[in-house]
C-alpha cells in the first residue's frame, strides 16, 4: 500500500515547489518492518529522506535518519517522498499528538489503517483523537490478509 501511495502522491513539480509527500508507518514492530521494507527497496531508500523513531514514556524520539548524498549526478535531491517509521502504537498519546502536529493547515492528511482484522482497524480509527478529523484529514480503514503476494504485510498506519 505504501509503494502505491508513493506512486500516486508523486509531485511532478517538486523541483520548483519542493513539495514532498511524507509516508509514516506506525507499528509496534516498526524496526523489523523497516528493515524488511527498506531491504526490498534499497535503491529507493538510498535516494530518499527517511527517519526512524520510538514512542515510549509518552514521547516520540527520532533515533535514526537518512538524507541522500552523492546523487548530484542524478540531479541532486530529487525524490519527492519522505518516509518515517514509528515504533509504537496508534493508541499511544504521543503518537496521536504527532499525527495531530503533522496535520498543519496546508497539509492534506490521509490515514490508512491496515490491521490484520478489520474490526481492529475500525476500532483504531474510532480511537483516534477527534481533533485529527477536524484538520482536513481522511481516514481509510481495511482489514488485510496476513500475506499479500507471498510477502509479509508492512502495515499499521500510513499518513
Language-model-detected regions and their locations in the chain:
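Cytosolic regulatory regions of ion transport systems
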Residues: 1-159
Amino acid at each position: 500500500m505504501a509503494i502505491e501511495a508513493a506512486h500516486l502522491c508523486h509531485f511532478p513539480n517538486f523541483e520548483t515547489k519542493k513539495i514532498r509527500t511524507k509516508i509514516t508507518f506506525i507499528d509496534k514492530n516498526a524496526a523489523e518492518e523497516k528493515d524488511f521494507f527498506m531491504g526490498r527497496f534499497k535503491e529507493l531508500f538510498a535516494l530518499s529522506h527517511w527517519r526512524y523513531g520510538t514512542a515510549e514514556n509518552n514521547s516520540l524520539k527520532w533515533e535514526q535518519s537518512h538524507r541522500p548524498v552523492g546523487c548530484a549526478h542524478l540531479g541532486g535531491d530529487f525524490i519527492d517522498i519522505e518516509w518515517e517509521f514509528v515504533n509504537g502504537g496508534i493508541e499511544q498519546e504521543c503518537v496521536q499528538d504527532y499525527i495531530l502536529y503533522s496535520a498543519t493547515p496546508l497539509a492534506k492528511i490521509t490515514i490508512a489503517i491496515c490491521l490484520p482484522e478489520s474490526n481492529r482497524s475500525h476500532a483504531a480509527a474510532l480511537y483516534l483523537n477527534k481533533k485529527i478529523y477536524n484538520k482536513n484529514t481522511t481516514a481509510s480503514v481495511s482489514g488485510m490478509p496476513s500475506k499479500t503476494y507471498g510477502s509479509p504485510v508492512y502495515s499499521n498506519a500510513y499518513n
